[in-house]
Amino acid sequence: MITMMRGFTPALRFNQHLESKGSQTMREVNAEAAKRVVVWFSCGAASAIAAKMAILDYPELPIILAYTDTGSEHPDSQRFLTDCEKYLNHPVKILKSDIYKDTWAVWQKAQYVGGIAGAPCTGALKKGPREAFEDFDDLQVFGYTSEETHRANRFREQNPHVMLDTPLIRHGLSKSDCLAMIERAGIELPAMYNLGFKNNNCIPCSKAKSVGYWRLIKKNFPDQFERYAALCETLGKDGV
């Protein structure tokens, strides 16, 4: 867990370090500033390739691949995780909330599934375990692709204490590039992709807004669809 030291935030320290390095590459600056690299593996194609890039980019630093298990993803995610451990020749450390079993437990407790205030499950099952694990000198790697520069910028603005690296953006890799690289490596993509979903997210993901997404959920996971619909009806207008 990150703790602030006499008002000297990691972001301030990192920015000062960056400003002093002139023409050094971002990789070189990152390697000098960090004591370890933590790659946030999400059981998706992009995060798997981001892990591959990080391992290649930072051979001089300890690498930790960490996965925050929400308890609500497709069971095939475990198979993909195991395949990626073999592909990367590196173990994945599994982190999980000490309080909540899955997204359903969070929604029931919060009496809220998502909306303007965001989704409570993200904070409880993803952000919470991540923040409990991260440290002051970590270089944190996320699998933002070349199409997601805006998301990476927003993360930096909202998390100024984090030293963030986005190797897919640095290397100009798109989501389709990542999918192709996984397939070329002989790894079967997570089942959710093969069912037509764009991401290997929870079933269901309360942040999803598209009609197409919910049609796929209803088609492929009718029990979860009906359970979610019943929960939203029970919570009423205050729950969504």
Specify the residue positions occupied by each region the protein language model found:
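Nucleotide-activated chemistry modules centered on ATP-dependent adenylation/adenylyltransferase
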Residues: 2-240
